[in-house]
Amino acid sequence: YNLAVERINKMGGVEVDGKKYKFEIIYYDDESNSGRAAQLAERLIKQDGVKYMLGPYSSGLTKAMAPVTEKYKIPMVEANGASRSLFTKGYKYLFAVLAPANVYLDVAIDLAVEKNGGKPVKIAQAFEQDAFSQDVRLGILDAAKRTGSNIIIDDKLPKELNDMASTLAKVKATKPDVLVVSGHTK
């Protein structure tokens, strides 16, 4: 963001209704805590007077901030929150630059079916239980249904994952054509 703001400001800023505006980035550490993110969004709007917001990292934090930006009619452009649920709530001031998470990996199933001569494939999947990962999972389920493929493993990963031996043992025993895993680095 800093590079973009620097360049835009060097070129004179942005013109709106015949008036030029320069950008300034103000940010705080939300500590990856959704309550804190909502609180800081309110602070940015009410105390710092921001008129435009760049979204936080993750669907969870975006989900916490969106009601605040909606309340104050502040546009928020989101580059890191992709949970489908963000875009089904009717928000008027939330804009995204990426596709929703449910379409992230569905094409992998289409490709696997294509590589398998157009025949359905066996799919193993393991997902964390957060909104983003569950939306990716729903996309895989939709792709499996659409292609006639079978989900042979559908594991839920714990938030504090230290060992995937159980899931990997199932994968080894069932020999799926595709393994899809979605989670987050800690």
Q: What role is predicted for each listed range?
A:
Residues K92-K159, V178:
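An alpha-beta-alpha
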Residues N2-E6, K10, G35-K46, K51-Y52, ...:
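Solvent-exposed, polar/charged alpha-helical surfaces in well-ordered, non-transmembrane soluble domains
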Residues N2-I25, G118, K145-G148:
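Signal peptide-proximal N-terminal region
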Residues N9, D29-D30, D48, E128-D130, ...:
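Acidic side chains
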